[in-house]
């Protein structure tokens, strides 16, 4: 069995049942290119969104699964939402542009994007029957939330599989969205316990009615981030750059499923951008072939995802969860915000904007600072990174950390200490510029997960060493768009549906 899902129909009867279900629900699937460039979405479709709240399980919200939502998450934005981290915070001259995943619909995180691409790819090829089968979403939190929301919109049952130790807010959201309490499956451990998730999925997969949509091995995850997140990062950079001579020097991304980092491949091809992969220092899989527990929720470790283009990665950076937990407290507490405004003289609007940054976003920001220092980037060297979700998902984590490490009271003196130790004093330790030999070592580490444990053939595993393999995935987007258009056309013969499915730039 090949682990790459090609853009071709494999089961016409099952596809026909999927078409009947989306016809019944009045669904028109956005093409991948439309999500990359929402300017190509028909005006009639966009106008209907005005009456739909972004967090409702409505079919219209499929069209909001893109980077171009306004700050209120309802309207359309001409440029993806981003904030710029200035030298007064980072201590480096290189501007750091942070894309904001909070603006995505339903889950307030950009992981709904690969969830959509995964299920859409299954539906249009006839690999999934939304009437009789369940969509199983293995995740450390945000991807399974995205999967459950997309499943609900598309009329099928979604099951979340995630570690029991994830934030309370994740589980509270899931409890409101799943069809049945049994559709939340808690596995042992926390963020880095991905193996336990795989084991549960292997058990569930024995039932043919359960279809595993594994983000760590779904190349639709790579493809959608390559085109959508890559395009959004480029657009945000261009908007920030203006008519200056700045260059897109670096792209920084934590490697949870290694989907987001695919945007780096897009940017490297077009701008020569250096790609930096981020992991928790407490679980230094790439840095040291290490292992351990950590609390940078949103990135899973102790293995190399199948969809990580390791041979195109330039730098690996380790960030401690002590730093990210403390930054979550600094920017998310009244005392911290008061310190930043009053003592550091930071703009109040800038300080408030950090509400849009979650724990993994802080990891990416700190890693960007490390990258800028390591590579001696200057004011014309722009680094782009991503805040997957917002601080609102980590209120409970913030409270727990305050109680455990600050005795329940966090004041402006504490805030000053955190600012100094976690931002201005950030060093270039645990930064590894990769040689070809180092890339091969990291690549080979994936063998033990994917070949020995998950049954990927050696041939399929090895194909991923070549950049031509990844270029082939990226170049398949027009074929996927065509499959989606054909699926839509069969689901509805109306002129409106036809124009919605075929509009593109």
Regions found by a protein language model. Name each.
Residues 1-505:
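PLP-dependent amino-acid enzyme catalytic core
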């Amino acid at each position: 069995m090949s682990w790459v899902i090609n853009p071709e129909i494999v089961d016409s009867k099952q596809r026909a049942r999927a078409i009947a279900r989306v016809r019944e629900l009045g669904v028109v699937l956005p093409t991948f290119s439309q999500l990359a460039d929402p300017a190509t979405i028909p005006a009639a479709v966009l106008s209907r969104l005005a009456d739909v709240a972004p967090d409702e399980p409505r079919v219209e919200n499929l069209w909001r699964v893109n980077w171009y939502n306004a700050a209120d998450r309802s309207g359309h934005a001409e440029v993806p939402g981003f904030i710029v981290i200035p030298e007064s915070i980072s201590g480096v001259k290189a501007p750091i542009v942070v894309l904001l995943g909070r603006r995505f619909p339903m889950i307030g995180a950009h992981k709904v994007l690969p969830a959509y691409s995964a299920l859409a790819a299954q539906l249009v090829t006839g690999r999934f029957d939304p009437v009789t089968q369940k969509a199983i979403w293995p995740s450390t939190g945000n991807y399974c939330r995205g999967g459950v929301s997309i499943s609900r919109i598309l009329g099928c049952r979604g099951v979340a599989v995630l570690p029991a130790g994830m934030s309370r807010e994740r589980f509270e959201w899931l409890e409101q969205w799943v069809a049945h309490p049994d559709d939340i499956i808690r596995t042992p451990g926390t963020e880095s316990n991905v193996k336990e998730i795989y084991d549960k999925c292997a058990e569930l997969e024995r039932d043919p009615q359960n279809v595993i949509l594994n983000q760590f091995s779904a190349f639709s995850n790579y493809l959608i981030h390559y085109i959508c997140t890559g395009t959004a990062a480029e657009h945000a950079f261009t908007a920030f750059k203006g008519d200056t001579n700045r260059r897109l020097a670096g792209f920084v991304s934590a490697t949870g499923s290694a989907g987001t980092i695919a945007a780096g491949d897009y940017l490297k091809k077009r701008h020569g951008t250096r790609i930096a992969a981020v992991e928790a220092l407490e679980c230094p899989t790439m840095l040291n072939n290490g292992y351990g527990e950590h609390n940078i929720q949103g990135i899973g470790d102790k293995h190399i995802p199948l969809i990580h283009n390791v041979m195109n990665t330039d730098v690996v950076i380790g960030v401690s969860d002590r730093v990210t937990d403390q930054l979550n407290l600094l920017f998310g507490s009244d005392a911290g915000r008061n310190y930043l405004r009053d003592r550091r003289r930071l703009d109040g609007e800038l300080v408030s904007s950090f509400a849009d940054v979650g724990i993994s976003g802080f990891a990416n920001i700190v890693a960007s600072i490390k990258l800028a220092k390591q590579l001696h980037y200057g004011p014309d060297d722009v680094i782009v990174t991503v805040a997957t979700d917002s601080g609102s998902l980590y209120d409970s984590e913030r409270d727990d950390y305050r109680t455990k490490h600050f005795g329940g009271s966090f004041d402006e003196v504490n805030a000053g200490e955190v600012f100094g130790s976690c931002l201005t004093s950030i060093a270039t330790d645990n930064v590894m510029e990769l040689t070809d030999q180092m890339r091969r070592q990291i690549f080979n580490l994936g063998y033990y997960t994917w070949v020995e444990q998950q049954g990927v053939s050696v041939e399929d595993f090895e194909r991923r060493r070549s950049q031509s393999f990844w270029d082939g995935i990226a170049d398949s987007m027009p074929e996927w768009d065509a499959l989606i258009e054909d699926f839509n056309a069969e689901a509805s013969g109306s002129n409106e549906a036809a124009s919605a499915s075929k509009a593109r730039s």
